[in-house]
């Protein structure tokens, strides 16, 4: 029975000295995980799959940013990484060597999010300066998209080959869809009652999920530019990730990670590690998520600087 699947905590990856703010994987390198942190670095991990109780080993630390790294992503060909930082810049890195190959300078505030087109031609970034910027790969700003009236917390380019859509989310409580061809607004998605901190696009680019302060996840149909339905996370949401091969959505909330089954619009599982009980300490929270390319593992970055690895299992009846 496929519906009996649950997620089991399999291991941890330790190497960062600050909150793990972002995670990225790529089908081009199934044994690779990239993480970004408040410690100003990125770490490239080689995933070992649990041999010797180790789920992965840090292979390289990418240094160069002078402030918190807020977001990381990997190019579709698996050759490059991109990072967004509170130092107001983006960096393009050679994923193999860990060297910076390009800096992107122009934002007037912390850069909070970055995304690269599948064809590798365009890069978009979102900032506390309330703008989305569109760049080419040699670091030239091609356009500045204005329209949000508060911090732009997240931006994603559609993964679909046929699409030139960019989705952005803001603390102004709106999600916007932009056309990269002429930099116009396709649609404004209204519905959140608090700031939005994260968005994720489905693997085929047809769906967007957004969430944040109000504890409600809204699913949007990007083909028809309309609201589909909502899911109740019942807690502030820090991160979202669609499974690459199941109709699931993972949400990192202040009260644990929730896995929703989208077909049934129901909660499949809730992931809460056992933390040592502290007198005053809050439990660490998951603030970043990424599924492995095969959908069998969920990686979560936490505020105790640790990455936890959950595996999809079918309990033997």
Curated annotation (Swiss-Prot):
Chief place where the protein resides: cytoplasm
Stated role: Component of the ribosome, a large ribonucleoprotein complex responsible for the synthesis of proteins in the cell. The small ribosomal subunit (SSU) binds messenger RNAs (mRNAs) and translates the encoded message by selecting cognate aminoacyl-transfer RNA (tRNA) molecules. The large subunit (LSU) contains the ribosomal catalytic site termed the peptidyl transferase center (PTC), which catalyzes the formation of peptide bonds, thereby polymerizing the amino acids delivered by tRNAs into a polypeptide chain.
Single GO cellular component term: cytosolic small ribosomal subunit
Keywords: Cytoplasm, Repeat, Ribonucleoprotein, Ribosomal protein, WD repeat
GO process annotations (BP): cell adhesion; cellular response to neutral pH; cellular response to starvation; filamentous growth; filamentous growth of a population of unicellular organisms in response to biotic stimulus; filamentous growth of a population of unicellular organisms in response to neutral pH; filamentous growth of a population of unicellular organisms in response to starvation; G protein-coupled receptor signaling pathway
Molecular functions (GO terms): G-protein alpha-subunit binding; GDP-dissociation inhibitor activity; protein kinase C binding; protein-membrane adaptor activity; ribosome binding; signaling receptor activator activity; structural constituent of ribosome; translation regulator activity
Protein name: Small ribosomal subunit protein RACK1
């Amino acid at each position: 029975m496929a519906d009996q699947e649950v997620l089991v905590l399999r291991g941890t990856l330790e190497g960062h000295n600050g909150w793990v703010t972002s995670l990225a994987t790529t089908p081009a390198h199934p044994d690779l995980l990239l993480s970004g942190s408040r410690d100003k670095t990125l770490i490239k991990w080689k995933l070992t799959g649990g041999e010797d109780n180790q789920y992965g080993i840090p292979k390289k630390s990418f240094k160069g940013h002078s402030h918190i790294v807020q977001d990381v992503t990997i190019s579709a060909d698996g050759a490059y990484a991109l990072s967004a930082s509170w130092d107001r810049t983006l960096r393009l890195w050679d994923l193999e060597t860990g060297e910076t190959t390009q800096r992107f300078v122009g934002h007037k505030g912390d850069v909070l999010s970055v995304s690269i087109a599948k064809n590798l031609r365009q890069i978009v970034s979102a900032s506390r300066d309330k703008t989305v910027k569109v760049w080419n790969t040699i670091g030239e700003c091609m356009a500045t998209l204005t329209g949000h009236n508060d911090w732009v917390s997240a931006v994603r380019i559609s993964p679909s080959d046929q699409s030139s859509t960019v989705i952005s989310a803001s603390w102004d409580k709106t999600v916007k869809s932009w056309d990269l061809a002429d930099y116009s607004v396709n649609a404004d998605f209204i519905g959140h009652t608090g700031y939005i901190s994260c968005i994720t696009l489905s693997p085929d680019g047809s769906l967007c999920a957004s969430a944040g302060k109000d504890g409600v996840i809204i699913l949007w149909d990007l083909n028809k530019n309309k609201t589909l339905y909502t899911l109740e996370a019942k807690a502030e949401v820090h991160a979202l990730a669609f499974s690459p091969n199941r109709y699931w959505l993972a949400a990192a909330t202040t009260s644990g990670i929730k896995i929703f089954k989208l077909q049934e619009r129901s909660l499949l599982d809730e992931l809460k590690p056992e933390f040592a009980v502290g007198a005053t300490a809050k439990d660490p929270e998951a603030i970043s998520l990424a599924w492995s390319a095969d959908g069998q593992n969920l990686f979560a970055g936490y505020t105790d600087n640790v990455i936890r690895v959950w595996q999809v299992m079918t309990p033997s009846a």
